[in-house]
């Protein structure tokens, strides 16, 4: 095992949320809110093909529509979409991803990892609460703030 690309996971300059949502109580909305209010000073990009904005923040229709590759992506999409999202992120140049999505069976997990491998894209998850880096103001998690 190597530490290659871990700096993008633990010290990102930009973050994209794939699966941002306006739906109250959804993981995509909680993570979007946490990212915006955590104090992170880097670039935050939201991705959802059904919205132009979410809470006033511009929203991109897809990973490939992003103006630049984020250092870190947070994935909160349905299980069957995760391998394709990871493949798009890898092709776009993203080097780390946190997959909050739960419910990936063994085949989907394997396809996700195979999509990440050619680009050495580091993956945390699936089925995790997210990633919190207090020293950077990053709350890329589905944990409700108290």
Regions found by a protein language model. Give the residues of each.
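Catalytic-core regions of core metabolic enzymes
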Residues: 1-146
């Amino acid at each position: 095992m190597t530490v290659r690309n871990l700096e993008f996971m633990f010290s990102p300059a930009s973050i994209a949320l794939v699966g941002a949502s306006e739906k109250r109580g959804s993981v995509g909305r909680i993570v979007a809110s946490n990212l915006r209010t955590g104090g992170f000073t880097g670039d935050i990009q939201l991705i959802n093909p059904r919205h132009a904005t979410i809470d006033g923040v511009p929203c991109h229709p897809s990973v490939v529509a992003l103006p630049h590759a984020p250092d870190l992506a947070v994935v909160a999409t349905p299980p069957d979409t995760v391998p394709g999202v990871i493949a798009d992120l890898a092709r776009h140049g993203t080097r780390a991803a946190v997959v909050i999505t739960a419910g990936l069976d063994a085949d989907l997990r394997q396809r996700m990892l195979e999509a990440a491998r050619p680009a050495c894209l580091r993956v945390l998850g699936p089925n995790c609460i997210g990633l919190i880096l207090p020293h950077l103001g990053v709350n890329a998690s589905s944990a409700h703030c108290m």
